[in-house]
Amino acid sequence: MLTDNNTELLLPFVQEENICLPLPINVVSKYWDVELPIMEAKEISKLYPNNFGSIMIEGIELAERNGLECKIIHSSIPELKKIIDSGIPPIVILPGIPEITQHASVIFGYNENENTLLHYIQKGTKEGEQQEGAIPIPIFDKEWVQDGRLTIILAPPEIVSSLKINKKTEEESNRLCFISEKFSIQKNYLQASEFARKAIELDKNNSTALNLLGGLLNSQNSDECVRYYQESLKQNNKNYLSYSGLGNFFLKTNQIEKAIDCYNRAIEINPKRSARIYKNRAYLFEKQKMNSKAKEDLKNYLKLSPHANDRGIIEQAIREL
């Protein structure tokens, strides 16, 4: 549906998903009347035992094997509207809830009068009708920018080409990031690092790739991670994961003031994205004898993670501070 002030695409109601066929990929594929084989996705998922998060690249490649084309870009609000106006429901990468790092959401419309975007919500009704959530564009963009405004365009090849989005190097670099994440989930950190480095070679300004390599180096306790996190923040100073990653590295290396500063900056960007960041900062405050601040952070940790396994220990620590 298209009017002067809004566009709204009609998406199918979908419930079936798998870690290798994430719901947004399945929804958009069905929108194009492409039925993706769930059994193939289930077979691929055996490569990821004990993993509960979505492997987006597996869903993308499954869709591509069934005739759709994909572009992964860093976008903008005007471009997002252009994509929707072209009849394509874009998939955007947004911050997750604690402690889910990220989640993908399908945007299927916008309303200029209300300055909102419409995103698909997985909620069943007896009628199976489409569920929607309206989010004010300024609030959406504040969240979206934290992960570089990553956007997945999935459509038949002729429709993708009609968009005339010419970001070939960026697209290839972003795809390599998604492949790197796949290997990281498989705990193949050597391959993950290789693909992240290739992504940076293609696009040295790709904040997603720079943060990704920073995280991989951080997991190896390499101080080289600092440079990549800092480069990521030069490209996107709202990159929450780079600030929190830097904070974690400085915590491990006992650089207390630097760690607190990075955690502060991450929390300023998004105070509800992570519970663990409050527990980490509380530990640092306690080391600096800032007990009231430590106590407040532990309360925030429990507020964001009410079912934390260490709840009893944390409650005891709060009483003792």
Placement of each model-derived feature along the sequence:
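Conserved active-site-adjacent core of cysteine acyl-enzyme catalytic domains
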Residues: 1-11, 29-31, 36-155
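Noncatalytic regulatory segments and standalone regulatory/sensor domains
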Residues: 110-202, 207-211
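Canonical positions in the second alpha-helix
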Residues: 199, 231-232, 265-267, 300-301
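TPR/Sel1-like alpha-solenoid repeat signature
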Residues: 176, 183, 195, 210-217, ...
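Structural marker of alpha-solenoid helical repeat scaffolds
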Residues: 202, 235, 269-270, 304
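Glycine-centered coil turns and helix-coil junctions that link the paired helices
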Residues: 220-222
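Active-site-adjacent structural segments surrounding the nucleophilic cysteine of cysteine proteases
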Residues: 1-52, 96, 113, 173-183, ...
